[in-house]
Amino acid sequence: MDLRVEKTERAIKNAFLSLRGRKALEKITVKELCALACINKSTFYAHYEDIYALSDALEKEVVHSVFKSITGGREYTLENSDVFTRDLYMAFVANSSLIDIVFSGKDKSRLGDCLEEEIKKLIWSKYPEYKNDIERNIL
């Protein structure tokens, strides 16, 4: 990715997290986010459709990075699900301040949906036969 694009993405996300830590999602405007990120509104809209699209992208990114941090060096199976659960819990504790900001207010309930999506991806990558098996596909 182009360095300028990376810097712009980082500025947008940092500005959003700063605002989200102080305000409800519905109260954040593109105008104030752009002022804080030192970008034009057209630049923001080149990256995201609206504030809600940015929020959705950050939610998925946060949960994905939590899962990536625990699956990087260890092989999980259904037989050692207790180890996976413990590691997942510890990863969430380590990232709790970011998770609290991104999933605060009305968005708190979306954390479960994002978790379910990532767990399905993880299980189906290891056990693809479970995806279409009604008895095994408990998610």
Whereabouts are the PLM-identified features?
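Alpha-helical structural segments
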Residues: 10-18, 36, 53-72, 83, ...
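Hydrophobic alpha-helical connector segments
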Residues: 70-98
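Amphipathic alpha-helical packing segments from all-alpha helical-bundle domains
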Residues: 106-131, 137-138
